[in-house]
Amino acid sequence: MVSLEARVREVKGKREARRLRRRGEVPAVVYGPATEPIPVKIKRSVLEKIFHTISEATPIQLIIKDDQGNTVAEKTVFLKMVQRDKVSETVVHLDFYEPTKGHRMRINVPLKVVGKPVGVEKGGFLEVFHEEIPVETDPDKVPQEIEVDVSSLDLGDVIHARDLKLPEGVKCLLEEEEAVVSVLVPKEVAIEEATEEEEEAAEPEVIKRKEEEEE
């Protein structure tokens, strides 16, 4: 579990949010089914150290302190939403979700692709349609990642949502027929195969005509 420190944000509003960002802090809010929204602020320098290591499925121990440095609350939360500046792409606001025991939650879990498909060895290329899988689960059963082995995939093969192996109690929210990963056939290979099929289909007709002429 990742640990992150936040400070209570006493003053709210857009003007205050801009002031915080200029000071190197990121405004955020904590909420949940049984949690009243708590406005907080986090040092950008602290956030940047862990941001590349967490996903929406990573449980975070959020230590909330007041301006004097006294701990007022410790909560297990998940990163629910990240707002970024449209131009600079820097993080401007965060939403943290505190689940309640017995209350199922919807969350996106990273997809981990392992292995090299046999179809890639034949000139195909692997297409990943979903880098994250939306699931419904109990808070204490959130998987850190969903692994899918693509080693046996040949040209044109597809792994659908129904093929994913999920832990007990975790439900995939994609349609069963939804494609997750596939080995796509390169255009030139597809044209070659189509030409060969046409030639094979035409061959018996040519032979038949020859036989008729000989008669």
Swiss-Prot record:
One GO cellular component term: cytosolic large ribosomal subunit
Molecular function terms, GO-annotated: 5S rRNA binding; structural constituent of ribosome
Stretches with biased composition (Acidic residues): 192-203
Region listing for Disordered, in residue ranges: 192-215
Keywords: Ribonucleoprotein, Ribosomal protein, RNA-binding, rRNA-binding
InterPro entries: Rbsml_bL25/Gln-tRNA_synth_N (IPR020056), Ribosomal_bL25/Gln-tRNA_synth (IPR011035), Ribosomal_bL25_b-dom (IPR020057), Ribosomal_bL25_C (IPR037121), Ribosomal_bL25_long (IPR001021), Ribosomal_L25_dom (IPR029751), Ribosomal_uL5_bac-type (IPR020930)
GO biological process, one term: translation
Biased composition (Basic and acidic residues): 205-215
Keyword RNA-binding attributed: yes
Family matches, as Gene3D superfamilies: Ribosomal protein L25, beta domain, Ribosomal Protein L25, Chain P
Family recorded in the similarity comment: Belongs to the bacterial ribosomal protein bL25 family. CTC subfamily.
UniProt xrefs under NCBIfam families: bL25_bact_ctc
Subunit architecture: Part of the 50S ribosomal subunit; part of the 5S rRNA/L5/L18/L25 subcomplex. Contacts the 5S rRNA. Binds to the 5S rRNA independently of L5 and L18.
Protein name as it appears in the record: Large ribosomal subunit protein bL25
Taxonomic lineage from the root: Bacteria, Thermotogati, Thermotogota, Thermotogae, Thermotogales
